[in-house]
Curated annotation (Swiss-Prot):
Native source organism of the sequence: Cereibacter sphaeroides (strain KD131 / KCTC 12085) (Rhodobacter sphaeroides)
Cross-referenced InterPro entries: AlgH-like
GO cellular component, one term: cytosol
Identification of the protein by name: UPF0301 protein RSKD131_2391
Family: Belongs to the UPF0301 (AlgH) family.
């Protein structure tokens, strides 16, 4: 089971408060583990413009303003830009299932600051990581639902509504979602 490009949707029974009502886009998944970015938990006290200022990256008047999210509990000082696949930085952009790109170099920040770069993007500070077999065990334990990641939902500005919106997209009423696992 390769979850690359899939969304993990936290179940109501999620025991880890860091992932309560979270959506995590899995960017890489292999027998060695998995890496993903939480896409619906904005950082309240840091704007993209403020981050550019901290990094001494000048912002043009037409510079883009993308949302900054907490990508996960690992390496929170490290930044990742999740974006549409219409932007590629040679040797630096990782293509995720052909639907998304992930770039973690300063060139994408500079492009966005100039008003260029990908048509859709969000910034993530930190990432979510799993060791070998860990994410599969969590899915099996019913901590997460998995689904294909719709681009329009991933890049939506409605961060508070993304979790419920994804469940509804899957045909699930969040009020009737059971936290009890059943296995045949």
């Amino acid at each position: 089971m390769d979850l690359s490009g899939s969304l993990l949707i936290a179940m109501p029974s999620m025991a880890d408060p860091r992932f309560e009502r979270s959506l995590v886009l899995i960017c890489a998944h292999s027998p060695d583990g998995a890496m993903g970015l939480v896409i619906n938990k904005p950082v309240e006290d840091l704007s993209f413009a403020g981050m550019l200022e901290q990094l001494n990256i000048p912002r043009a008047p037409n510079g883009r303003d993308i949302r900054v999210h907490l990508g996960g509990p690992m390496e929170r000082g490290r930044g990742f830009v999740l974006h549409s696949p219409d932007y590629m930085s040679v040797g630096a952009t990782m293509l995720v299932s052909g639907k998304f790109g992930m770039t973690a170099t300063v060139d994408i920040l500079e492009a966005l600051a100039r008003g260029q770069g990908p048509s859709s993007a969000l910034m993530a500070l930190g990432y979510s990581g799993w060791g070998p077999g860990q994410v599969e065990a969590e899915v099996q334990r019913n901590d997460w639902l998995t689904a294909e990641a719709p681009s329009e939902l991933v890049f939506s500005d409605d961060d508070p509504g993304k979790w419920t919106g994804m469940l509804r997209h899957m045909g699930i009423d969040p009020l009737t979602l059971s936290s009890t696992a059943g296995h045949a």
